[in-house]
Amino acid sequence: MGRLLPRPALALAGALLALAALPAGAGMHPTRLLAERLLAEVDDTTWFAEGTGRKVLYVVIDPNCPYCHKLWERLRGPVERGELQVRWIIVGYLTSTSLGKAAAILQAEDPVAALRVNEEDFGFRDEDPGGGIEPLPEEAIRDETRLALAANLALMQNNNLFGVPLAFFRAADGRGFMFEGAPPPDVLKELLSLIDEEPAAPGGDPGAAPRAGSGG
């Protein structure tokens, strides 16, 4: 059905960065048009936020995806320094336990903490390689959780995107931008530097609970 993106070196990284340098008068590249669609449709998803930075990055991940795990690790610094807010959009389709793990994260009282458990214990479940969180059994997955996960997956499927991780954001030039895979740290730093800053918001815990998307 789907796949993960094995692009640790991201051969397309240079081309992606070149897209950002196109002058405003140039026709919008198809990749950036696709990013615009993702931003327009993100309100139909359920995400939870980690971090308090004014730069907002949406990331679609599967709990059992090793490249999603790499990207999670590489985003620790910007998130923990308060430079970045990541809005995690969870899907569950890669393996037989992905749905149960995705549901366990979404139904947790603190989804950010649940995702951290999944990532910090990644690869340590001998009987179930992948994310470290215990998957929920079928009967424990609430109907609203199934609907939320289906809507999250539909964001990808409706745009003919079938690999994770998938990241997208509003760039400083006002247009959408996206990338796939887990870029090397130096490339990731350049990509994150392109993100526009949102206006300062009232205080509060941005990662307390899942919510319907409200970004773009």
Write out the residue ranges for each language-model feature.
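Positively charged n-region of N-terminal signal peptides that target proteins for export
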Residues: 1-7
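Thiol/selenol-based redox catalytic cores and closely related redox-interacting motifs
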Residues: 95-187
